Curated annotation (Swiss-Prot):
One of its GO terms (biological process) is chromatin remodeling. The active site is at residues 144, 153. The keyword Transcription regulation applies. This is Protein arginine N-methyltransferase 7. Homodimer and heterodimer. Interacts with CTCFL, PRMT5 and SNRPD3. It comes from Bos taurus (Bovine). Arginine methyltransferase that can both catalyze the formation of omega-N monomethylarginine (MMA) and symmetrical dimethylarginine (sDMA), with a preference for the formation of MMA. Specifically mediates the symmetrical dimethylation of arginine residues in the small nuclear ribonucleoproteins Sm D1 (SNRPD1) and Sm D3 (SNRPD3); such methylation being required for the assembly and biogenesis of snRNP core particles. Specifically mediates the symmetric dimethylation of histone H4 'Arg-3' to form H4R3me2s. GO terms for molecular function: histone H4R3 methyltransferase activity; histone methyltransferase activity; protein-arginine N-methyltransferase activity; protein-arginine omega-N monomethyltransferase activity; protein-arginine omega-N symmetric methyltransferase activity. It is found in: Cytoplasm, Cytosol; Nucleus.
């Protein structure tokens, strides 16, 4: 059965109705899931297995049957571990139907159908009793309901319900306990992901400073956690202000509460500085004694950095304090962690909340609009002084005193730079209510509300009256649009340029004047694991899961690239970067496709995991901004990526299986095509084997 789905096209800006298979969302969810990453997490799997064996033994030693409840079973892996460890029966709960169906097949293939019952329900819908899903309560509770924030996937409500309705009192739990840790730091880099810094502009009239509005300065920021691969942040980018502080623990073997709570820890700052950011992670203890532990600690806080397990399904958290606070070495303070049923947040106080009688605040919510429009990388991009200087220098070469400037980018400060550099008149298109409100606040804070005209409408609806009857002599864009996911989605700027063509005057300048698509073939240190088949996991056959992921990828995404912030995922280039498509913004979008095909020579030995693609914007003939590689790869091929943008990764499925030989490919052939009607870029890459690679 086919269904029609309406989608906004991020490149063309139009709404399209697409005919999709009725299960297309299932395929997409499976293809983009972390199932493969979890199966490759050797440390996690081994620790769970050890904890399950110990829990089953404790129940058996009491002379009881071991009845297991496995919530969020996924592949059924943990249930199969339990049965192998001696459990008498397992009830494996999985709410996602395609996953539950796969679990049934995996359990059957491994010969456990008589001892594992897969229940396709949410755990809160499971019933107990003679006619229920479970005839009686379980005495062992196994779960893997955790995300990077620990509680963000609803672990607390699920545990709370399970203890009340599904498991016996004093049951065994695997994991037994979780502890959340925090460390206070000062970091201009991470703080730049949350606040707008002043921007200094040298003009013919002296220095001008663009400042953030007071609402933005006071705003607590976005409520969502910032989860990153913290080990990829250079130690030079932050100063540690406190020891690692255990903030709170949850004992999963007892009744759990999902009610809001706060936990404070007194500490003495190690050095004086500005408290801006809380780094946080957690560990889980699989047994009551805490001998079997799985930790998310970053390298500097890990008991054995050499044994650090890479994983992408659990990372580390960055929390931003509502305001930066000065701290003095040795002067005691309280770090306070708050949580509700799904979120954690932090504050810094002079005394503990219990002593000062304060009621803990509600979850922080953005009230300045900026955190609704700009995500964390976008804040970092706007605060990047080198990038801003590059735009300023480019603007100086194209501006004239009588220029009429039209700026097209979501929530961009380019219009303010253009005004300060001396153009006659500036218009900016902000076609969303959020961007319109934010830019209005920023203009007002800088006394520019009557200097820059905001047009709140779609570009194709622009009229001469909106431009006060004037022709545009300078069309500006970064470009940046909030709807963009893949690098080339910002080609929406080209479609806007085409839509406003009638409003451009003779000899109008477009900046950037062009863009180009670039590619490099890489070997990832770890990211390949998220798309790699597992085969066997801790002795269990999970090929069915591999096949399901492959079918989901083949359904849509096997010929598509996916966005990843590659500064978090180290890789080495195996080829030189290569330009494969160009887009001339000085001309409207063409009617015919832009096609390219060719060969990429591999110049370094390694396993070719995929091709990385990114855009470069040519502001002028002499100035280019890259959203991908920032400099040529070093001798070893190590890549340095733009930290404010996601790059596109096209995985080569044939090289993702770690059991396959590295191969002897020396070239990669490609076919890439830009389709003007849809704005899509289709691509295909093929590894070509050589008789003798010399590797």
């Amino acid at each position: 059965m086919k269904v029609f789905c309406g989608r906004a096209n991020p490149t063309t800006g139009s709404v399209e109705w697409l005919e999709e298979d009725e299960h297309y969302d299932y395929h997409q969810e499976i293809a983009r899931s972390s199932y493969a990453d979890m199966l490759h997490d050797k440390d996690r799997n081994m620790k769970y297995y050890q904890g399950i064996r110990a829990a089953v033994s404790r129940v058996k030693d009491r002379g009881q049957k071991a009845l297991v409840l496995d919530i969020g079973t996924g592949t059924g892996l943990l249930s199969m571990m339990a049965v192998t460890a001696g459990a008498d029966f397992c009830y494996a709960i999985e709410v996602f139907k395609p996953m539950a169906d796969a679990a049934v097949k995996i359990v059957e293939k491994n010969g456990f159908s008589d001892k594992i019952k897969v229940i396709n329900k949410h755990s809160t819908e499971v019933t107990v009793g003679p006619d229920g899903d479970m005839p009686c309560r379980a005495n062992i509770l196994i779960t893997e309901l955790f995300d990077t924030e620990l509680i963000g996937e609803g672990a607390l409500p699920s545990y709370e319900h399970a203890h009340r309705h599904l498991v016996q009192a004093n049951c065994e739990a695997v994991p037994h306990r979780a502890t959340v840790y925090a460390q206070l730091v000062e970091s201009r880099r991470m703080w730049s992901w949350n606040k707008l810094f002043p921007i200094r502009v040298q003009t013919s009239r002296g220095e001008r400073v663009i400042i953030p509005p007071l609402e933005l300065e006071r705003c607590p920021g976005a409520p969502s956690v910032c989860d990153i691969q913290l080990n990829q942040v250079s130690p030079a980018d932050f100063t540690i202000l406190s020891d690692v502080l255990p903030m709170f623990s949850v004992d999963f073997s007892k009744q759990v509460s999902s009610s809001a709570a706060c936990h404070s820890r007194q500490f003495e700052p190690l050095v004086s500085g500005r408290a801006q950011v809380v780094l946080s992670w957690w560990d889980i203890e699989m047994d009551p004694e805490g001998k079997i532990k799985c930790t998310m600690a970053p390298s500097w806080a890990h008991s054995d950095p050499e044994e650090l397990q890479w994983r992408d399904h659990w990372m580390q958290c960055v929390y931003f304090l509502p305001q930066e606070e000065p701290v003095v070495q040795g002067l005691a303070l309280c770090l306070v962690a708050y949580h509700d049923d799904y979120c954690v947040w932090y504050s810094l106080q002079k005394t503990s909340p219990e002593k000062n009688g304060r009621v803990h605040p509600v979850r922080p919510v953005c009230d300045c609009q900026a955190h609704l429009l700009w995500n964390r990388p976008r804040f970092g991009e706007i605060n990047d002084r080198n990038r801003t200087d590059q735009y300023i220098q480019a603007l100086r070469t194209v501006l004239k005193p009588d220029s009429v400037c039209l700026c097209v980018s979501d929530g961009s400060l380019l219009s303010m730079l253009a005004y300060h550099l001396g153009v006659e008149q500036v218009f900016t298109i902000e076609n969303s209510a959020v961007s319109h409100r934010l830019m209005k606040k920023i203009f007002k804070a800088n006394h520019l509300e009557d200097k820059i005209n905001i047009i709140e409408k779609r570009p194709e609806l622009l009229t001469p009256a909106d431009l006060e009857g004037k022709k545009v002599s300078l069309l500006l864009g970064e470009p940046f649009f909030t709807t963009s996911l893949l690098p080339w989605h910002n080609l929406y700027f080209w479609y806007v340029r085409t839509a406003v063509d009638q409003h451009l005057g003779p000899g109008a300048v477009v900046m950037p004047q062009a863009a180009s698509l670039h590619v490099v073939v890489v070997e990832f240190r770890d990211l390949w694991r998220i798309r790699s088949p597992c085969g066997d996991c801790e002795g269990f056959d999970v090929h069915i899961m591999d096949d399901m992921i492959k079918r989901a990828l083949d359904f849509r995404e096997s010929k598509e690239a996916e966005p990843h912030p590659l500064w978090e995922y180290p890789c080495s280039s195996l080829s030189e970067p290569q330009q494969i498509l160009t887009f001339d913004f000085r001309q409207p979008v063409p009617l015919q496709p832009i096609h390219a095909e060719g060969t990429i020579e591999l110049r370094r030995c390694g396993r070719s995991h995929g091709a990385v693609l990114w855009m470069e914007y040519h502001l002028t003939a002499d100035s280019t901004v890259s959203t991908g590689l920032l400099k040529s790869a070093e001798d070893e091929g190590d890549c340095c990526w733009n930290p404010h943008c996601k790059q596109a990764v096209y995985f080569f499925n044939t090289t993702l299986d770690p059991r396959a030989p590295p191969g002897s490919s020396q070239t990669v052939t490609y076919t890439v095509e830009f389709h003007p009607h849809t704005g899509d870029i289709t691509m295909d890459f093929t590894l070509s084997d050589a008789l003798d690679s010399g590797c």
